């Protein structure tokens, strides 16, 4: 059983009798001497789909749920459901648009390395690769000689995702984006 400080995004925990999937972790350090860090977990209740916020001290011990991961690829859209296919045995996994809204910002037809997270045989989440390649759909014109500058500008991707990119990047450039931090890494 891990401590709160050992938890990561994508883990499933049991808290107050509910099975929760961790979507985001925010760490705060209270002022004063000897204050332990506080971990604010933004979670989704796997039974109801409701959003739940939980707070724990760094040394609180939590129960985790056993999870399995299977490689998947995006298949098609059926109404408001997105269908993903297991790469090994072609099992379909359906997710409603609002369940995977954040992940959809990174999912293009050519994305590789996605996994479905299974808890008790049920698909509960999609795990993205650590980085994805995307083509910039719209950004301000590039500035010649700006490679020495550290200034950035917003760039919009075909999925609607907006990231800050260096000034020398232009519309149509293929870039690599860190999915966890939603930040530009480099040109592809």
Curated annotation (Swiss-Prot):
Q: NCBIfam families attached here?
A: PRK00529.1 (NF001810), PRK04542.1 (NF003392), yeiP (TIGR02178)
Recorded hits in Gene3D superfamilies, A to Z, give:
2.30.30.30, Nucleic acid-binding proteins
This protein is called Elongation factor P-like protein
GO-annotated biological processes: peptide biosynthetic process
Which top-rank group of organisms is this from? Answer: Bacteria
Its Gene Ontology cellular component terms are: cytoplasm
| SMART domains the UniProt entry points to | EFP, Elong-fact-P_C
For this protein's source organism, the top of the classification is:
Bacteria, Pseudomonadati, Pseudomonadota, Gammaproteobacteria, Vibrionales
Question: What does the record give under GO molecular function?
Answer: translation elongation factor activity
Give the family, as the similarity comment puts it.
Belongs to the elongation factor P family.
Record-linked Pfam families? EFP (PF01132), EFP_N (PF08207), Elong-fact-P_C (PF09285)
Output the InterPro entries linked to this UniProt entry.
Elong-fact-P_C (IPR015365), NA-bd_OB-fold (IPR012340), Rib_uL2_dom2 (IPR014722), Transl_elong_fac_P/YeiP (IPR020599), Transl_elong_KOW-like (IPR013185), Transl_elong_p-like_YeiP (IPR011897), Transl_elong_P/YeiP_cen (IPR001059), Transl_elong_P/YeiP_CS (IPR013852)
